């Protein structure tokens, strides 16, 4: 995954969030994982060719991750989860002019001693 400055920073900032429909964020194999397991977060939007970004709300002041799409979706892979990877995630996408989508619903990821089921659930704020 590629790290980028937070969108409120001066360089490379997103100018117009909310111009495109919000994407869907899902977790595979599920939102409840054990340390050391692999996790894929999929961000999917309706528009092809956009750049996708994943944000962990607990790390807003640090950065977010960028991915080039596979058609209209991007996968953010965590090879070996750690306890500190648990948290509230959301995603968005944007075009080459830094015009962005609405933010996805928040997806809560747990990293515990037990593993959960498929796909995850979004938390509506």
What kind of region is each of these model predictions?
Residues 1-25, 48, 115-125:
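N-terminal Sec-dependent signal peptide, specifically the hydrophobic helical h-region
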Residues 104-110:
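C-terminal edge beta-strand
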């Amino acid at each position: 995954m590629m790290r980028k400055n937070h969108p409120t920073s001066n360089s490379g900032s997103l100018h117009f969030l909310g111009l495109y429909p919000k994407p869907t964020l899902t977790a595979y194999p599920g939102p409840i994982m054990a340390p050391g397991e692999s996790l894929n977060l999929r961000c999917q939007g309706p528009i092809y060719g956009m750049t996708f970004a994943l944000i962990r709300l607990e790390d807003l002041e640090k950065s977010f991750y960028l991915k080039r799409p596979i058609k209209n979706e991007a996968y953010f892979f965590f090879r070996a989860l750690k306890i500190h990877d648990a948290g509230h995630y959301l995603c968005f996408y944007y075009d080459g002019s830094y015009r962005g989508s609405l933010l996805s619903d928040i997806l809560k990821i747990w990293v515990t001693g037990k593993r959960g089921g498929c796909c995850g659930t979004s938390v509506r704020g």
